[in-house]
Amino acid sequence: MSLSTLFSPNTYNINSKSQTLNNLPSNPTSQTNTLWSNNAYNPPHLMFGSTDLSNGGGGGGQKGEKGDKGETGSNGLKGETGSNGLKGETGSGDKGDKGDSGTDGLKGQAGTDGLKGQAGTDGLKGDSGTDGLKGQTGNDGLKGQAGNDGIKGDKGEPGNDGLKGQTGTQGIKGDPGAKGDPGTSVVLSSGIWTPSVTFSTIFTGITPSTSIYSRIGNIVTFSIFTNATIPANMASGIIYFTVPVASSDFNGNNVIGTASITGNSTGVVQYGILTATASTAGIVLSMKIQASTSISVAIYATGQYFIPPG
């Protein structure tokens, strides 16, 4: 309660006694005031006892028992704010009981959502960046493995025969050709003969057998067969044979054929050639056969020679 309320004309109940406080002094703390003479510095609301305040009051009686807690009164009107009073001495009264907890207040309604702000303007477009440096050329990739050969396709079916073309018109008969010059005659002959031996060295037991020849124009082809015996480790041997057809153009420097022995012979041919004699038309066999002992051999000689025209 404020001081202005305390010192306004009001009626207070003190120990079931009523007293109207009127015309209170402006300075209730003065010690010369009769009303406060026995209770200096103690406002009336702190005094206790059964003495009627109108008779001056007696001394304070004994402190009675603490009464029951009264019901909470309604709030009085708020008085005007008085001037600050002097600070009282600290009281030593007992601490009052803790009041009941008040009920929770009602929850306020949710406020409405605020308005959405306007969209900002678009920012300025930045400058284009400079082109990056060109990268180095990469290494060549590894060469791939060769692919497998493809499977050969099936053989196609034979095509149909093409259409026969139309017969062309008959051509114009050409003029008769000029008569040619008379041709030369060509000698054609062949036969068998048994060559004769006109000279020999190293070889012994020479026995020529039936041989063959053929002539086409100026060329004579021949084949001679003969048996002979050679000594062990022979040197080069020679046999002269007569020709089947005479020729006037023999030259000893010309090789006209070769010679060999049959497979049944045990010797080894080191060489065998045929040449021609210049002095007397004949076929010359020059041959060397290697053998560790004297053996008989069968010799085959083939060749060609030329017959001049005339």
From Swiss-Prot:
Glycans are attached at residues 227, 264. Residues 92-101 have a biased composition (Basic and acidic residues). Residues 1-183 are annotated as: Disordered. One of its GO terms (biological process) is extracellular matrix organization. Residues 1-41 have a biased composition (Polar residues). GO terms for cellular component: extracellular space. Residues 61-119, 123-182 form the Collagen-like domain. Pfam families: Collagen (PF01391). One of its GO terms (molecular function) is extracellular matrix structural constituent conferring tensile strength. InterPro entries: Collagen, Collagen_superfamily. The keyword Glycoprotein applies. It comes from the Viruses. Keywords: Glycoprotein, Repeat. Belongs to the sputnik virus V6 family. This is Collagen-like protein V6. It comes from Sputnik virophage.
